[in-house]
Amino acid sequence: MNIVLVTATRKEIEPLLQYLTERIYLRKHQKVDIVTTGVGMMNTAYCLAKQFAQYRPTLAIQAGIAGTFHPIFAPGMVVSVKEDMIGDLGVMQNDQWLDLCDLGLAEPNTPPWKDKKLMNP
């Protein structure tokens, strides 16, 4: 099994890296690649496209803060994202946020969108 562990910055996963380093010998039939993408969607998309094209992982895991800071998510907490709203694609106009759908640049229910959200299948 080839696993890709994805993070924007290595600092986000330092405790996990220490854990894996100490125990990697237990994973003889599994390969774990660490991919540090840099912050932001464009960096992540570029790095993952390059990684996936070359190595074809069996499983990819996003680790780190995943672009969010919220007091209900304690450091080290594991979450599964069911849906996502992209806060980087849009504009502020008259003190109001307008997303791609509001601007007429995307349809709210045309894949990959559902009710203006990206759904995790």
Where do the language-model regions lie?
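Mid-sequence, gly/pro-rich, charge-dense loop/helix-turn segments that line enzyme active sites
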Residues: 70-121
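N-terminal short beta-loop-beta anion/metal-coordinating cradle
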Residues: 1-55
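Short, active-site-adjacent cap segments at secondary-structure transitions
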Residues: 12-13, 67-70
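Proline-aspartate-enriched helix->loop->beta-strand connector
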Residues: 56-61
